[in-house]
Amino acid sequence: MYTFSYSTHNELLEFFHLFVTIQWLALIGQKTLSQFCLYRNAAVVGFFIRFTFGTPIFLQLL
């Protein structure tokens, strides 16, 4: 059975929190669906960049 390492679990939790935050910002700001999808895709891309290359590069891209 595959088990997540502690660091991977933290990355997934951070991604989930980021995704939920972006959802709330989109709802509160009454963004259009296309804008929301853009934010969602940016969150997914940012997550994979951070997961692949590590935190420093991810923070530099911000």
Swiss-Prot record:
Gene Ontology cellular component annotations, sorted alphabetically: membrane
Keyword line: Membrane, Transmembrane, Transmembrane helix
Residue spans crossing the bilayer: 9-29, 42-62
Subcellular location: Membrane
Chief localisation class: membrane
Membrane topology (UniProt): Multi-pass membrane protein
Protein name as annotated: Uncharacterized protein YFR010W-A
